[in-house]
């Protein structure tokens, strides 16, 4: 059973060989048809062979309010320092210009070398590697190493990495007890958020608030937390799934690949000799690769925001998972399934399309904040759907999805607005076909994204520009008021106030009693 305790040298060597063999076996299980289907999409990711030309210089700003001219430095990356705008003032009482950027639409708070996106060309690369190549040839654990340390591992490095993750895949019994104490119908994402936060309590050795703020300067300490979280994430997720199903948690296996082990914990029913379908495990592994990282999205930004305070990594990632729990971020594929179910049949698509154009219906799974082209992850996922259906049976909603995509991409309304399928459009169909309930979809997003969160956490610790994140605001409230006693106040009729707070019948029963 994997634990955080050391094994004997002979067992260590034996286990490394075992996990390496499992890794190589899993990598070879991808059917030729899947490899060939992905091959065509690798070309599009290579369209921009050379990096964009970098030109630095100065920007001249003329302030028409005062007639003054200002020179602002422009970096090679095409950025200016927001603090340079503070010198643009109208007088001694003016504190300078601020950038008002709701949602950070055009604000870059970090420099990062982890992932690259070109939304116009539909390109996504991890550390320079096209996502299509990694999905075709790599494994999730190998990609996690790439994201973390900047290069693909050697064979021996991969064996050490897989062993470290496996070594830390078991969770403390106290954490299992916490999960088991939650309501039987607790949402799996709520369980995951709570469990990630609770890990901080079980590992005080990893808390800078308890061990000193320089704790994470130690590479050994950092690496241990990385292995802990990547190792424990699927175990916690499996416990949440089994709690929802009314079944006891299952200990992880040390003889399976990362994705196989996850499916084993879900499906073994205590049978230690059980092995998941290798093709389904490979599909899940590819999905994990596709969801592992996506630069400064909402939840990754939350992780870096929290980490900037020096908080422990478990709390930082708990906040990130909490952000992912939001339906605008991690729950879109569930909305796609609901939409496709409501459409029902291919014959209803024209009416639905017109409803979208008339703003009477909402199309989920199309469009992206970054991509103004076909999401490269969606191309891969669409092909994976056929692989899953060949094993578990075809989902009739796939015909609706394919026809809806075709109709939208041939309609000027969507083409003009650059609305293309995103990563969520087909992923929900795959997860449903594999037997996952909709409430578990976001958990399947969170497990692999731990690698991206941790890569950004690690990068932020080494970045000399990292500061505690403290954005400015534009104040729009009352300028100055003085305190008036309650009995003398005149509250405007249209003033905001506390609304009616509902009282349960149980509370009404209690309040109707005496002695209260």
Curated annotation (Swiss-Prot):
Q: Supply the SUPFAM superfamilies for this chain.
A: Citrate synthase
PANTHER family the UniProt entry points to: CITRATE SYNTHASE (PTHR11739), CITRATE SYNTHASE, PEROXISOMAL (PTHR11739:SF4)
Q: Organism source for this protein?
A: Cucurbita maxima (Pumpkin)
Sorted alphabetically, the keyword list is: Glyoxylate bypass, Glyoxysome, Peroxisome, Transferase, Transit peptide, Tricarboxylic acid cycle
The extra comment attached to this record reads: Citrate synthase is found in nearly all cells capable of oxidative metabolism.
- The family this protein is said to belong to: Belongs to the citrate synthase family.
The annotated pathway is: Carbohydrate metabolism; glyoxylate cycle; isocitrate from oxaloacetate: step 1/2
Question: What's the protein name?
Answer: Citrate synthase, glyoxysomal
Q: What class of enzyme is it?
A: transferase
Tell me which residues form the transit peptide.
1-43
Pfam families, per database record: Citrate_synt (PF00285)
Q: What are the GO cellular component annotations?
A: glyoxysome; mitochondrial matrix
> What's the EC number here?
2.3.3.16
Catalytic reactions on record? oxaloacetate + acetyl-CoA + H2O = citrate + CoA + H(+)
GO MF annotation list: citrate (Si)-synthase activity
Q: Give the UniProt subcellular location, in the record's own words.
A: Glyoxysome
Which InterPro entries is this protein grouped with? Answer: Citrate_synth-like_lrg_a-sub, Citrate_synth-like_sm_a-sub, Citrate_synthase, Citrate_synthase_AS, Citrate_synthase_sf
Q: Where, by residue number, is the active site? A: 329, 368, 424
Task: Supply one GO BP term.
Answer: tricarboxylic acid cycle
